[in-house]
């Protein structure tokens, strides 16, 4: 039976990030994904690398600071799939006073190590604005767009580039400790072929299924509860020709993004709905469609109806249960749990997390795993470039060269 240093179960952004980091430190790594890479939560995001402006209202300063710093790192790691984007925030005084927004944006500008992105500014909307006439003022700040699925794929490519192995459509069916090692069994979901490996360490990065794998795959108690929060988006024909995205405030204190996508479309989302079903079966509800249309139509001159929707998508955020009353108040921060058996066979489990902070999450995961591996290499991903990201010149020059081809 083949022995690996580390087996990572889960081919979303957290699993791929941990596997890539571990492989780059010299460990023999195997990553198992039951379906396809980024097939669940990681490809159903708002496709943003952002600090999370709204998290400041929940006093999540550590998370915002880390996310803002990582935003700068990821722009350098993945310039081919991550791009700066300006966000316009229409001011609606009865929801949040201007002074509160200014303080929030000041903190947003300064909490992270912002070096490449312009800071926030105030705006006045004139007669040619795409917004309704009563919306006359607003704010603009910087965040970034990313191709979420390709970010996962690039990390999986890095696993292979660093000597690791990635198996998709291979479901881990069980994992147990035996003689100081993990015995991991898996099955090819297409052919039924069975596999088994030994591993010195195991990572449970199965996202919405993290607790289920504890219960059914390892028959161990999960150290934390998970709350599944559904986020849905609608995709419509491009609602304006501007390059900027919009971040809309709603009466329930939530925010909704309107994001340019693929030149011809706009993504509108997201929602926050408690979800109890199978994560694979998640889909948008009519109430969510009505909610997103209402928030959009409250702000924009160009009105949308159900008939304008060309596509919808939904994902499930696996958030660590902090007993918050409402879905939007649950922390988006991550928790890493590690335990072993007599100093061997560590199990590291990932609860929560964000697309933006995946690299730092992976680095923290390897910090926890390092004591179990003699001779493991140092942290390295902060200065790395993901496969495909080694472009010559700046991003605009690179894009122009591609267009000329």
Language-model segment annotations:
Residues 90-167, 174-180, 302, 321-329, ...:
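Flavin (FAD/FMN) cofactor-binding and adjacent substrate-gating region
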Residues 23-44:
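Glycine-rich FAD pyrophosphate-binding loop
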Residues 2-4, 191-201:
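Core beta-strand elements of the Rossmann-like FAD/NAD(P) dinucleotide-binding domain
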Residues 142, 148-150, 158, 218-267, ...:
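C-terminal catalytic lobe of FAD-dependent flavoproteins
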């Amino acid at each position: 039976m083949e022995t690996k240093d580390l087996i990572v179960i889960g081919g979303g952004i957290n699993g791929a990030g941990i596997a890539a980091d571990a492989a780059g430190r010299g460990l023999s790594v195997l990553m198992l994904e039951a379906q396809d890479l980024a097939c669940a939560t990681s490809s159903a995001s708002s496709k943003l690398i952002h600090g999370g402006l709204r998290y400041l209202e929940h006093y999540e300063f550590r998370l915002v600071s880390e996310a803002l710093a990582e935003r700068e790192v990821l722009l350098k790691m993945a310039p081919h799939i991550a791009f700066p984007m300006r966000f316009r925030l229409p001011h609606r005084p009865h929801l949040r006073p201007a002074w509160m927004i200014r303080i929030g944006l000041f903190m947003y500008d300064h909490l992270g190590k912002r070096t490449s992105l312009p800071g926030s500014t105030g705006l006045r909307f004139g007669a040619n604005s795409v917004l309704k006439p009563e919306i006359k003022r607003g704010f603009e700040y910087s965040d970034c767009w990313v191709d979420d699925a390709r970010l996962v794929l690039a990390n999986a490519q890095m696993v292979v580039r660093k000597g690791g192995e990635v198996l998709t459509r291979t479901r881990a069916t069980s994992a147990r400790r035996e003689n100081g090692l993990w015995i991991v069994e898996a099955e090819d979901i297409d052919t039924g072929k069975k596999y088994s490996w030994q591993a010195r360490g195991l990572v449970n990065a199965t996202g919405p299924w993290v607790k289920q794998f504890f219960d059914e795959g390892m028959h161990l108690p999960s150290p934390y509860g998970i709350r599944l929060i559904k986020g849905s988006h609608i995709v419509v024909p491009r609602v304006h020709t501007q390059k900027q995205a919009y971040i809309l405030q709603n009466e329930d204190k939530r925010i909704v993004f309107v994001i340019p996508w693929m030149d011809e479309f706009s993504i509108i989302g997201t929602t926050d709905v408690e979800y109890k079903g199978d994560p694979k079966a998640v889909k948008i509800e009519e109430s969510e469609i009505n909610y997103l249309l209402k928030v959009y139509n409250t702000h924009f001159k160009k009105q949308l109806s159900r008939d304008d929707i060309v596509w919808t998508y939904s994902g499930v955020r696996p958030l660590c249960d902090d007993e918050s009353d409402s879905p939007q108040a649950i922390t988006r921060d991550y928790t890493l749990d590690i335990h072993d058996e007599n100093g061997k066979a560590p199990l590291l489990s990932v609860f929560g997390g964000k697309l933006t902070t995946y690299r730092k999450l992976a680095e923290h995961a390897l910090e926890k795993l390092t004591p179990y591996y003699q001779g493991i290499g140092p942290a390295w991903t902060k200065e790395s470039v993901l496969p495909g990201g080694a472009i010559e010149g700046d991003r605009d020059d690179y894009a122009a060269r591609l267009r000329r081809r």
